[in-house]
């Protein structure tokens, strides 16, 4: 059963301008250590950060909160499953909100797709629940 859907699209050039203007201040405020390690190693650094930014926005929409009600940027981070598939790791207020949304006897699964085609990056998040084993 789907309990949340969110999407976001962002202009990579806007992220590049933000990186140029604010640099580490922007990165440290928004991104997790895992996200920074992934993005800093990429040739298309701004596109990598843009996809992750869009994923956070999409996830906050799927949670039904946006960036409020105790949900902060670093509470959500893009991580990869063993096979390489992206998903979101939640902590803090984002994790608390997910727990509130999840019906008893079920567990939440976060599906994420991220893509970029210059000048845009996009993310789509679906939060579903499945019965606990």
From Swiss-Prot:
Its main location: cytoplasm. GO terms for biological process: fatty acid biosynthetic process. Coiled coil: none annotated. It catalyses: apo-[ACP] + CoA = holo-[ACP] + adenosine 3',5'-bisphosphate + H(+). Transfers the 4'-phosphopantetheine moiety from coenzyme A to a Ser of acyl-carrier-protein. Belongs to the P-Pant transferase superfamily. AcpS family. This is Holo-[acyl-carrier-protein] synthase. It comes from Parvibaculum lavamentivorans (strain DS-1 / DSM 13023 / NCIMB 13966).
């Amino acid at each position: 059963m789907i309990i949340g859907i969110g999407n976001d699209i962002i202009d990579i050039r806007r992220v590049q301008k933000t990186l140029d203007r604010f640099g580490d201040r922007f990165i440290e405020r928004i991104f997790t250590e895992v996200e920074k390690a992934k993005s800093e190693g990429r040739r298309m650094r701004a596109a990598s950060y843009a996809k992750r930014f869009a994923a956070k926005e999409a996830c906050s929409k799927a949670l039904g909160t946006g960036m409020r009600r105790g949900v902060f940027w670093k509470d959500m981070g893009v991580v990869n499953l063993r096979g390489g598939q992206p998903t979101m790791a939640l902590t803090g207020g984002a994790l608390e909100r997910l727990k509130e949304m999840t019906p008893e006897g079920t567990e939440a699964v976060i599906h994420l797709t991220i893509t970029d085609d210059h000048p845009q990056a996009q993310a789509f998040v679906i939060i579903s629940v499945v019965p606990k084993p």
